[in-house]
């Protein structure tokens, strides 16, 4: 597998983050605000800029057919590739007992591929339409962060 050839270049880290991927607390917000609820993150990344030119992931990412397929499935057009040269098609790596907690990605949507089946865990959870432009829906986000599973779906 491509990643195994570069495993020594994976940057591993542990942090406490909120659902918005921030690691710093904002004491100007109320104590029960979702941005003040922190969870442990223990994972690593192989950034896109270190991939070889013949990378399988890079090849897949650059295919117009994949972009058109996603656009057709979602009914969204146009869809643009992320221009960030470090993160546009990075590998997210977890060791046993690693975790990437429930969070919002920094893009309107993200396409994730599970490259290797985990021995345990690895369940992808999401909450469809929990927020929308102009409405962060903080009350519902807080419920999910507090353990309410009514809106949570699994893949």
Language-model segments: residues:
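Non-heme Fe(II)-dependent double-stranded beta-helix
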Residues: 2-69
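Catalytic core of non-heme Fe(II) oxygenases with the double-stranded beta-helix
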Residues: 67-155
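General structural signal for secondary-structure boundaries
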Residues: 1-2, 137
């Amino acid at each position: 597998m491509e990643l195994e050839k570069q495993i020594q270049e994976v940057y591993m880290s542990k942090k406490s983050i909120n659902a918005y991927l921030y690691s710093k607390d904002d004491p100007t917000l109320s104590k029960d605000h979702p941005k003040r609820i922190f969870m442990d993150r223990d994972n690593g990344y192989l950034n896109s800029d270190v991939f070889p030119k013949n990378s399988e992931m890079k090849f897949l990412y650059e295919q117009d057919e994949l972009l058109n397929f996603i656009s057709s499935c979602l009914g969204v057009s146009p869809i643009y590739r992320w221009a960030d040269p470090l993160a546009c098609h990075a590998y997210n790596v977890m060791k046993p007992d690693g975790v990437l907690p429930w969070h919002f990605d920094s893009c309107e949507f993200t396409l994730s591929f599970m490259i290797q089946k985990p021995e345990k865990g690895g369940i992808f959870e999401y909450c469809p339409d929990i927020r929308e432009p102009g409405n962060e829906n903080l009350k519902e986000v807080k419920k999910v962060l507090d353990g309410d599973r009514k809106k949570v779906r699994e893949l």
